[in-house]
């Protein structure tokens, strides 16, 4: 069976039919008759194409040339077929319409690669979006659970406080819950009650003073907060969290040398502290600059 994407177009003229090749989505199908003939389907019409031998005999008869028998022509099929194939390829390569049609039928690997690349980008964006949604959902659920836990804890502790059976530790826990819920006045109240009722270890009491100092600083009551932090480090000198909070409060109050001293105290107990080290290094430069400005002003006076 012969299969091809080529269609023959017959051009009428005074000369014998000339067959020109155009690329199209038709097929050359073998005829049901003699094997020397091929039927060609063109736009719903079937055209019989003569074999090479019949075509040569017709040309000789039309031009009045000496007759040749088929036996002598059997020596020429290879040369004739090669010649016709060369002529067909020459016409295909020379005709611009044929070249354009050939370009249409050629596969386009660049287009396919670009399409795959675009699809991969879309999938990447989709996966990224799903990941962000998943992370956001996780944090939202976590916050809801934490808030619910705090609410339950606060409710239970408040019931004990109302009954008058709350211990100093329970008052401290209730004050810490209020601090986390950002109810600072309530946190101050319960933490102060815990300090007054405290009868345990002084080092544990330092945590109560530190929590009360944090509550005051968040209300922008820096002096009261600093006083609580200083009490905490007095009760527990190695309490690095209270030292960091004290340094932060001093820096907010623009007392840079005292803030620098607090962060240096942290590094004495914890040399690799990730909070105190960068703060200390930044404050060193600021303190040097501040001292230089003060020295210049004193000289001018």
Curated annotation (Swiss-Prot):
Induction trigger: Induced by light.
Positions of transmembrane segments: 82-102, 121-141
Major subcellular site: plastid
A single GO cellular-component term on record: nucleus
Disruption phenotype: Seedling lethality when homozygous. Dwarf and pale yellowish phenotype when grown on MS medium supplemented with 2% sucrose.
Start-end of each TPR repeat: 168-201, 206-239, 240-273
Gene Ontology terms describing biological process: photosystem I assembly
Domain of life: Eukaryota
Compartments where located: Plastid, Chloroplast thylakoid membrane
Disulfide bonding pattern of the chain: none
Transit peptide: 1-61
Membrane topology: Multi-pass membrane protein
Keywords: Chloroplast, Membrane, Plastid, Repeat, Thylakoid, TPR repeat, Transit peptide, Transmembrane, Transmembrane helix
Role description: Nuclear genome-encoded factor required for the accumulation of photosystem I (PSI). Functions as a PSI biogenesis factor. Cooperates with PSA3 to promote the stable assembly of PSI in the thylakoid membrane. May target primarily the PsaC subunit.
Subunit structure comment from the entry: Interacts with PSA3.
Name used for this protein in its record: Tetratricopeptide repeat domain-containing protein PYG7, chloroplastic
Taxonomic path: Eukaryota, Viridiplantae, Streptophyta, Embryophyta, Tracheophyta
Primary gene name: PYG7
């Amino acid at each position: 069976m012969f299969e091809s994407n080529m269609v023959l177009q017959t051009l009428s003229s005074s000369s014998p039919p000339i067959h020109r090749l155009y690329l199209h989505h038709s097929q050359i199908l073998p005829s049901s008759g003699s094997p020397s003939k091929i039927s060609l389907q063109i736009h719903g019409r079937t055209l019989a194409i003569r074999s090479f031998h019949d075509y040569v005999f017709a040309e000789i008869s039309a031009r009045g040339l000496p007759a040749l028998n088929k036996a002598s022509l059997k020596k020429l099929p290879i040369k004739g077929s090669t010649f016709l194939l060369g002529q067909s390829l020459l016409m295909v390569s020379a005709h611009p319409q044929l070249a354009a049609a050939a370009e249409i039928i050629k596969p386009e690997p660049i287009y396919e690669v670009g399409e795959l690349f675009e699809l991969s980008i879309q999938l990447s964006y989709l996966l990224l979006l799903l990941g962000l949604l998943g992370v956001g959902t996780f944090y939202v659920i976590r916050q809801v659970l934490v808030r619910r836990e705090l609410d339950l804890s606060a409710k239970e502790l408040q019931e004990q406080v109302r009954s008058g059976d709350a211990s100093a530790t329970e008052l401290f826990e209730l004050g810490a819950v209020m601090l986390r819920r950002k109810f600072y006045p309530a946190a101050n109240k319960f933490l102060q009650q815990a300090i007054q009722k405290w009868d345990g270890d002084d080092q544990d009491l330092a945590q109560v003073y530190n929590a009360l100092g944090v509550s005051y600083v968040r209300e922008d009551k820096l002096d009261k907060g600093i006083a609580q932090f200083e009490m905490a480090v007095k009760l527990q000198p190695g309490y690095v969290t209270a030292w960091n909070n004290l340094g932060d409060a001093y820096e907010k109050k623009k007392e840079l040398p005292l803030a620098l001293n607090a962060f240096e105290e942290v590094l004495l107990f914890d040399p690799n502290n990730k909070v105190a080290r960068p703060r200390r290094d930044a404050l060193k430069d600021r303190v040097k600059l501040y001292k230089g400005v003060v020295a210049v002003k004193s000289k001018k006076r």
